[in-house]
């Protein structure tokens, strides 16, 4: 798995907090939600380390990077704690109560900021999970990850902190940020919907086999936008650059974006970037793992 936004073991940091005075865009419920403020600097994190209720989590697929070095006081959360398998579908959201209980055990309550860093796709998938739970207005990304943190003089540790004080967390699930196969099939031909495929060109074309994808190719009408193009030199691109990439793929202010990939992991990076830019966006969690397994649904393969 590619690690970005990192040197020395940590990739990407998300700080759950909205900054006042930033540009805003409509969210799915018609309320005002932050379109900027998702990206912050190491200096910003340094100046907020003592904020009441601040929780720092490292999101990883294995424990090794955390044990090697982590932001002092950070707690480890594994991808398997916020994803689950449903039958043949490899990566799905666990039950809401399971997620809520786990986050409460990590010291997350209804106030305070949460900082996430770790392997890039582990972090963007966690961003999506928290956004689904209604915490999106508290989310930001510290560009540069642990490398930026240490360069700014931030304290690094190797031992885990004491157990967190359990908090009470109120969640407000947002089904409008999710898409399933039925929704995608019903809306994929609509002019106001843009399907973005986060996989490589070879996977999109169907010339490269993928584990768990019964029929190689892509969903008809989808546009390929490799998730790695969101990044440069270990950081998310500037908003202007991201905007140009999305515009070139067909995104406009009036369209709803649906991201997908193989199992819903790489799609979360496009989901994060779309949220950063203020687009209405859904993530098709089952992605090609589910879609290609439904023989009644069409798949385009370039030969």
Feature locations, PLM:
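Thiolate-centered catalytic microenvironments shared by cysteine-dependent enzyme domains
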Residues: 27-34, 93-182, 187, 217, ...
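Active-site-surrounding "flap" and adjacent substrate/cofactor-binding loops of secreted or lumenal enzymes
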Residues: 69-82
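Bacterial N-terminal signal peptides
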Residues: 8-19
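A mid-sequence, solvent-exposed acidic-amphipathic segment
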Residues: 189, 195-236, 245
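Flexible, polar/low-complexity N-terminal or interdomain linker segments that lie immediately upstream
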Residues: 14, 23-64, 143-212, 299
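Positively charged n-region of N-terminal signal peptides that target proteins for export
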Residues: 1-4
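Helix-loop module immediately N-terminal to the HCX5R catalytic loop
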Residues: 84-110, 226-257
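Solvent-exposed loop/turn segments at secondary-structure junctions
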Residues: 61-64, 80-83, 119-123, 146-148, ...
